[in-house]
Amino acid sequence: LAVPALAEGVRDANAAYNELLAGFNGKYPDEYAGAYVDTSDGDKLCILLTERHADTAAKLGAAQDKMLAHISAAYRDDVKFKTAKYSYNELLAAHDTASELLKDKGYGLSYVGINDMNNVVDVGIIPADHAAAAAFVQADAALSGLPLCVTAAERLSQLGGESPAAMPQAGGGAIIPLAAALLICGAMLGAAALKRKR
């Protein structure tokens, strides 16, 4: 399987992202609302800052400086900033709350994950449970105010032991190995770019 080479901008944006996360050391500051590579704008790392920490020019500058302090000068041209409503910590809490409450109610979860670009938690519910789960989310006091996007989604197996008839028929069998290969290649290219830039 040939994996296409990543553009230099994507490699540099990934390297900047890896440095940012390493600088956080597992503790996200309240100013941080997520990050993603914006391929529509020159393959830049778009770091999201919470609106309440960027509502004045002084706060915005301080929040940007705080993020850039974790990124080496060689990659700072590959970074841009936008604002978002929810901090990453708030999204993590929403993720945990939604996962726990929906599992406790017996709804079939396909996935639960943070969507940095849209500043929400994506929740995939198996189609048979989707309507009831969506109604539960809207009615439940603990869930209704959270940044959740609930959709119907089939489960993708990560075990590999199911028969082909039990698997989603949209080519789902090859998705996980390909995604893993791309992640590994991206990490290797990011590390190589980091060594090259320093």
Task: Give the predicted meaning of each segment.
Residues 13-29, 89-107:
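Short amphipathic alpha-helix segments
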Residues 1-7:
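C-terminal segment of classical bacterial N-terminal signal peptides
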Residues 154-172:
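C-terminal low-complexity, Ser/Thr- and acidic/Pro-rich disordered "stalk" regions positioned immediately N-terminal
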Residues 10-15, 198:
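Ser/Thr/Pro/Gly-rich low-complexity linker/stalk segments immediately outside membranes or between
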Residues 174-196:
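A cross-kingdom C-terminal cell-surface attachment/processing module
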Residues 29-92, 106-139, 151-158:
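Short glycine/threonine-rich beta-strand-turn micro-motifs
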Residues 146:
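Active-site regions of enzymes building and remodeling cell-envelope glycoconjugates
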